Amino acid sequence: MDDTEKRVHKYIEKHDLIRSDDKLLVAVSGGPDSLALLHFLWNSNLVPKEAISVAHLNHQLRENAAKEQRVVETFCERQGIPFYIEEVDIKSRAQSLQKGLEETARIVRYDFFEKVMAEKNINKLVLAHHADDQIETILMRLVRGSASIGWSGIQPKRELKGGQAIRPFLPITKAEIIDYAQKHELAYEIDESNTSQEYTRNRYRAQLLPFLKQENPAVYSHFERFSEETSEDFQFLEALASDLLKKNLIKNGKQTTLLLSSFKNEANPLQRRAIHLLLRYLYNEDASFITVNHIYQIIQMIQSDNPSSSIDLPNKLIANRAYDKLHFQFGEREAPSEFYHQLELNDRIELDNKASIRLKLKSSVVQTNGLNGMLLDAEEITLPLIVRNRVNGDRMTMKGQAGSKKLKDIFIDAKIPRQERDKLPVITDYTGKILWVPGVKKSAYDREFSRSKKQYIIRYTRNIGGNESMHNDIQKVLISEDELQEKIRELGRELTTEYEGRNPLVVGVLKGATPFMTDLLKRVDTYLEMDFMDVSSYGNGTVSSGEVKIIKDLNASVEGRDVLVIEDIIDSGRTLSYLVDLIKYRKAKSVKLVTLLDKPAGRNVEIEADYVGFVVPNEFVVGYGLDYAERYRNLPYIGILKPEIYSE
């Protein structure tokens, strides 16, 4: 074994690239690099010979493509190596995909490799990238302005669908590979396109690499060390960025939202790494769409004093900042649709967002207009009412203020995102007086109920269905879905140890504890029985009433049993205190309490849980079983509800 082979073996061991039970698919083009790699693996005894197979994709781009294919076939036939070949017209495929030749070739290659790996149950794809490729890649990315994570260059291994791609030749040079191929008399083809100065990589190879090697013969080892050190740094930073995104990211159908209130206070390097990670997620790990300029544009949006801004990113990705939220969504920009409706008495209109507006004569039983209604004195306005978009110069006469105020300033005060303002209905009377912008502001024409006057009432009904409006009611994600499941696994292990062999009666407190109980008991690995109680002191409010009611009692007897009570949250503690005392009174052998959330600031009785998932601040939290007026239980995370939602 010569020095070159020793360094490859050492590199494989250092990065744990190949294990004895791996099955290898070697990508072989017919050139010296990949044939040398195949020869090395075939003679290395790293894996049994029957664990090695070959894949070759004929791109049909060059005259000698058929010769290269024949070289691969001949080598494999002589050695008895299984090989898989596919021929693809890359030019035609590029036209149909509307992508460049190089990008299309890469996509098709990896699709082919992954297909073979899946069909043949192969877990490692072996590629022949070497030290020259590494230097070229790092320099190209630096000059092109790639995001900083690209500076680390080609990695020894990366995840693929159903396996890994590995690169054991990264520590050795092109010259060493040629020497190896000639030493072992390998017949290979030379890709004539590698000498063409039309390609960027070839210009770096021909003009920069010779200069660098002349300046410092140790340039290869220096770039190898640079790649490994920067990779380690980026991996550490990426772990922090991943945690940051888990706490501040909401995925809602086609839209992904980054919550900015705490995110923008993080250190700039962490923000940049988190944005890069987010873009990789959005672009499905295709880094070709991401440059450092895109990341800096987004960071500028986040740190700007302008609360409403928008930028277009590659592949029709749009980033919209709306005050403390940054929304990402693929698609075309929608031109604001203009609308204009006339509203006569007893008419009802429906807007594009499925909200509806209705005008009626005030009933004698109507005592209040509420937040979603407005009372008007008939003598002060002229019918029909007009429902339209805003227009430049709109002004509203304000209650308790002299003069009028620009609608634009009212929107800014209310923190209405710029891209949403043209969608809001502006209600005027027939003479043009602005009466109301539903959900934003009422004018000075808003009146109290009067039995003596003829009055109209406008009713605005929002479309509150659908997942989007539910997520938009959340001020901040407090505990992410991943954090919940990690804590539940931890609690499950503790409860398994506690109750092994005791067959406890597990009591779920309806309704809020149901999701928590369902996930938790999957993690408790011992026999148990389940029952439920529905005990409440809240109703549809946000503060405990102090009165505890049993809505559903247990079916099973607790006498002589070990009882574990599962609750979603301990707030005032009044409900749980009553329940625990009741179970003890019924002669349970033991009573223990596990709660997902504990809110000590709300406590007004003495009670402590035996097992606690998370301690939460004195905020109104919803999600994962917790509700407000029976809403939000199906959120997959724990979030803080916006105050305006429960104060309406």
UniProtKB/Swiss-Prot annotation:
Pfam families: ATP_bind_3 (PF01171), Pribosyltran (PF00156), TilS_C (PF11734). GO terms for cellular component: cytoplasm. ATP binds at S29, G30, G31, P32, D33, S34. Its EC number is 6.3.4.19, 2.4.2.8. The keyword Zinc does not apply. It is found in: Cytoplasm. Its main location: cytoplasm. The N-terminal region contains the highly conserved SGGXDS motif, predicted to be a P-loop motif involved in ATP binding. This is Bifunctional protein TilS/HprT. The lineage of its organism: Bacteria, Bacillati, Bacillota, Bacilli, Bacillales. The gene is tilS/hprT.
